[in-house]
């Protein structure tokens, strides 16, 4: 089993990849427009994936919620393995090394981004974008060597779903571990700040510079 996906081709040969993971209750179409927001020149292969678990009456998610910050271990680890295999296969199929791939997500997708991008057993990526999420607290997840790893974190100050404290905790933990953290708080609820997205265009371009 793999993940349903939607691809946005690069204009020419892809110079890297930009992969985005949606939040709870939506699907691979939700963040698809952000691929062009973040990579307007289409230098990168763009991809979005659908979480493997279904929610009635529609939409998908990545894991069962026990409490905010601590996913259900059984569904989390099953999805972690599935999503990791999908991501690795996508990059291999298109000949893109992990160090030229950016992974990002919103809400549950941000938690999965942290898991897939920070875990000790995973390949090092070019950068991570975590919007309104958290670093998951779950048995079996171990923070790897993140020294110098670019991580962009955005969070709404008035987020009633995932408190901004989770964003601050992720920021502080990653800075302490040596990551290169870009952090933005915005005066809004559980949503994505378009101004931060605009600022991230340059960040994305710098993380995957033009091939020599």
What are these regions (language model features)?
Residues 1-100:
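Serine-hydrolase catalytic machinery in alpha/beta-hydrolase-like enzymes
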Residues 33, 115-119:
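Active-site signature of alpha/beta-hydrolase-fold catalytic machinery across serine-
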Residues 58-65, 133-151:
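Flexible "cap/lid" loop of the alpha/beta hydrolase fold
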Residues 123-135:
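A conserved short beta-strand
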Residues 152-155, 159:
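Short beta-strand/loop motif that positions the catalytic acidic residue
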Residues 165-212:
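C-terminal catalytic histidine-bearing segment of alpha/beta-hydrolase fold enzymes
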